[in-house]
Amino acid sequence: MAEEKSFPMTADGKAKLEQELEDLRLVRRPEVINRIKIARSYGDLSENSEYESAKDEQAFVEGRISQIETMLQYAVIIDNEDVAADEVSMGREITFQELPDEEPESYTIVGESESDPLSGKISNESPMAKGLLGHKVGDTVEIEIPNGSMKVKILSVK
C-alpha cells in the first residue's frame, strides 16, 4: 500500500490554506462558471477565445481546490512544546551567520505550502532547512547546498 505524504505546516499556514480554499470555492469557482456561461452565449465555441480562457481558468481553480484539499487532509500541525527552546525546528525563526564573517540572516522554517523566501520563510524541504533542523544555538553546521557547501553558526532560535 502506498504511503500517503504528510504536509507539515504551522497553524497559521493551515488557516491561510483554509481561507484560500474558501475563496476558491465561494468566489473564484462561481465567477469562472459565470464566465463560461457568458462565453457560451456568444455562439460558436470552436473559435471562442473567452470560452477557452474561462475553461483554462476553471481547470486551474479545480486543480488548486483539489491540491489544497489533499494538503489539508494530510496536514500535520507543527507543535514545538516538546522541543528544546534553543533547538531549530519548524515554525521557529532561526538567525545564523555564514562563516567566516558574513552578515547574520534570519528565516522561519515552514512547510512547503507556506514557503516564501522573499518574506523570510523557507521550506522544511530546502537544503538550508534540512541542514539546520535539530541543531541548537551555538552549533556550527556544514550544510550541503546545490553549488557546494557552506558553514554556518546558529546564533538564535525564537
Curated annotation (Swiss-Prot):
Necessary for efficient RNA polymerase transcription elongation past template-encoded arresting sites. The arresting sites in DNA have the property of trapping a certain fraction of elongating RNA polymerases that pass through, resulting in locked ternary complexes. Cleavage of the nascent transcript by cleavage factors such as GreA or GreB allows the resumption of elongation from the new 3'terminus. GreA releases sequences of 2 to 3 nucleotides. Signal peptide: none annotated. This is Transcription elongation factor GreA. The lineage of its organism: Bacteria, Bacillati, Bacillota, Bacilli, Lactobacillales. Residues 102-125 are annotated as: Disordered. The gene is greA. Belongs to the GreA/GreB family. One of its GO terms (molecular function) is RNA polymerase binding. Residues 49-69 form a coiled coil. GO terms for biological process: DNA-templated transcription elongation; regulation of DNA-templated transcription elongation. Keywords: Coiled coil, DNA-binding, Transcription, Transcription regulation. NCBIfam families: greA, PRK00226.1-1, PRK00226.1-2, PRK00226.1-4.
